[in-house]
Amino acid sequence: MARDLIGPALPPGFKAGGSAEDEERDSSPVAGPALPPNYKSSSSESSDSDEDSSSLSEEGNQESEEDDTGPPARKLRRNQDDDDDDDDEGFFGPALPPGFKKQDDSPPRPMIGPALPPGFLKSTQKSDEGRSDPGQVSSDFNSEKETDSSEEEDIVGPMPAKGPVNSSVTAEFEKRAQRMKEKLTKGDDDSSKPITRESWMTELPPEMKDFGLGPRTFKRRADGKSGDRSVWTDTPADRERKAKVRGLVCSCISVHVGSILKKNRRQNYSRVLFLSL
């Protein structure tokens, strides 16, 4: 049916824009980027979907009824097939090699931090395993196993003694006193001797015997006398050596004094003889 147009007319070889069906059927080459050969545009998909909507709705109703009444394994298979189809549809670009397996979107990540030992299961896993296993074992055995596992999980720290505990503070004190008494009563040769402190612990050096007894005033001049203060630091070997040296000195002095006395006696005796003559 011809329409009356108002305005300038189109050129002779130009088609009118009203024939949308002719444009869809026209397979003229397109200038610019085009879709892949097996890829449908959204308009064609919408038209195809409009045409097949009635048939798909009927089939979908039948499939939904079958899925509701069918086994769960069949439902899972159909869901997986649908997911695979959704993943494959609309994919274009570089493809993986033939023998290369497609990785999951979220691959399992390695656990970071402290992990459970290899043979250790979480409480949730144990409960799931107990529920999944049918009643092959008696209920008494299962209850005992559950109680044992729960007790082992709740225990933290060292276990208490299983036998009777007879220890107490008073018993420990009595045992300790008994041991000390036995140690003192037995006594060795060294322990039988009276325990006394050495002289250098209880006595002051000779030059400090009057320490603190004199007038408490400052000294006007330094004390020229410097006694032997090595008494506090001498070892037994040093004391023995000093005693030997002191004995030798004393013996030498006594010999020298004796010789002088003998000489004086002789002189006195000669004087007496001379005076008597």
From Swiss-Prot:
Question: Which residues get modified to Phosphothreonine?
Answer: T147
Q: Per the record, which residues fall in region Disordered?
A: 1-240
Q: Which portions of the chain have biased composition (kind: Pro residues)?
A: 108-117
What InterPro entries does the record point to?
DUF3752, GPAM1-like
Motif GPALPP motif 4 covers 113-118
Superkingdom, natural source: Eukaryota
Q: Mark out the compositionally biased spans (Basic and acidic residues).
A: 172-196
N-acetylalanine modification sites are A2
Q: Which UniProt keywords apply?
A: Acetylation, Phosphoprotein
* Motif GPALPP motif 2: positions: 32-37
Q: Where is the composition biased (Acidic residues)?
A: 60-69, 81-90
Q: Where is this motif: GPALPP motif 3?
A: 93-98
Q: Give any Pfam family that matches.
A: DUF3752
Q: What are the Phosphoserine sites (modified residues) in this protein?
A: S28, S106, S138, S143, S149, S150
Q: At which positions is motif GPALPP motif 1?
A: 7-12
Can you name this protein?
A: GPALPP motifs-containing protein 1
